[in-house]
């Protein structure tokens, strides 16, 4: 999950888990669940449409600002749904990090952009321009095929977005083949 009992993933209670995953050479998939603020999003399927991307962004920011990528440098982590809103809010995160280090950089002195390429995201973003942006920002070697199957927002024909995105064959091959292998450590 993207949180555990509403605790961010950088909470002290979870450090033994991440240390064990790194020591055992395991891959970790972070998928949103139990979205924050659900009680305020009762209509229009907003927990699924707005809450899930926000929840994944929360998890990814917990990893970055909480120093988990530095603490566990060999840990292979993939964030579902293209990393949520992370890429779209990266400029804001960077700005917050630089203008309010007293609030943002308290557990990690490195800017959020320094972690681009340090984690994987899946391709399930439902939009070819967003997928292209992920590849541009993270690199094709950090985007893996995602479908969100069997959930209702899942891609009905897994791989359709990647195959019809206009990305070249080499990039598509990375998303379908070499990037997932690298994330899985095979």
Q: Residue spans of the language-model regions?
A:
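Mid-to-C-terminal alpha-helical segments outside catalytic/metal-binding sites
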Residues: 75, 121, 128-144, 150-186
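Catalytic pocket-lining loop regions of alpha/beta-barrel enzymes
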Residues: 1-138, 142
